[in-house]
Amino acid sequence: MGLFGKTQERPPKDLVNEWSLKIRKEMRVIDRQIRDIQREQEKVKRSIKESAKKGNREACVILAKEVVHSKKAVNKLYASKAHMNSVLMSMKNQLAVLRVSGSLQKSTEVMKAMQNLVKIPEIQATMRDLSKEMMKAGIIEEMLEDTFEGMEDQDEMEEQAEMEIDRILFEITAGALGKAPSKVTDALPEPEITGAMAASDEEEEEDLEAMQSRLAALRS
């Protein structure tokens, strides 16, 4: 509190340094998220190989779709890191300008980066707060509400995604299933039916559902 009950404004340099620290912290959150998804991806790939050996083509396709969705999620997270790095570089420039002019400057580059970052669920709350602080400091203009809303990016399995599924299956099963870039139409070799294999069908389905749930949780 300053004189007469007014809140004293913080020095611009302190604001920039604090923003940079918050962004670096969120980058570490993104890094952890990427590692978690990639670890789960490796488990899914192993499961695809096992399902291929058992002749369970349906499970292979379902799991391959999960790999495609996970790859998209990881790509989005890497893109968000690039936007964060862009903001960090702009913050360094702001400090340089601050030393010369004594004030922070409006930045369209930061504005564009923050518009993208507020759409990332994993870091949305922090990025919203940072955006409001930057607006108050005059670095960016006020964002439209629809920039904050409209976060749900529904990934539809279109033709390109189907081709990617086929490629993944071909790759992971060493050609037993899928012929990139054709769509998946191949049948897996018929496995030998044993009592143990029949008994494990229900357990395999439960494992499949559990794996899908874990990946969905990591992506959300």
UniProtKB/Swiss-Prot annotation:
Superkingdom, natural source: Eukaryota
Segments forming a coiled coil: 22-54, 197-220
Region (Important for autoinhibitory function): 168-169
Keywords from the UniProt entry: Coiled coil, Cytoplasm, Endosome, Lipoprotein, Membrane, Myristate, Protein transport, Transport
Biased composition (Acidic residues): 200-209
Membrane topology: Lipid-anchor
One of the GO BP terms on file: vacuolar transport
GO terms under cellular component: cytosol; late endosome membrane
Motif MIT-interacting motif mapped to chain: 201-209
Primary location group: cytoplasm
Pfam families: Snf7 (PF03357)
Region Disordered, annotated ranges: 196-220
Compartment(s) of residence: Cytoplasm, Cytosol; Membrane; Endosome; Late endosome membrane
Sites of N-myristoyl glycine lipidation: 2
Subunit structure: Probable core component of the endosomal sorting required for transport complex III (ESCRT-III). ESCRT-III components are thought to multimerize to form a flat lattice on the perimeter membrane of the endosome. Several assembly forms of ESCRT-III may exist that interact and act sequentially.
Function of the protein: Probable core component of the endosomal sorting required for transport complex III (ESCRT-III) which is involved in multivesicular bodies (MVBs) formation and sorting of endosomal cargo proteins into MVBs. MVBs contain intraluminal vesicles (ILVs) that are generated by invagination and scission from the limiting membrane of the endosome and mostly are delivered to lysosomes enabling degradation of membrane proteins, such as stimulated growth factor receptors, lysosomal enzymes and lipids. Involved in late stages of cytokinesis. Plays a role in endosomal sorting/trafficking of EGF receptor.
The family this protein is said to belong to: Belongs to the SNF7 family.
Protein name, as recorded: Charged multivesicular body protein 3
Top-level taxonomy: Eukaryota, Metazoa, Chordata, Craniata, Vertebrata
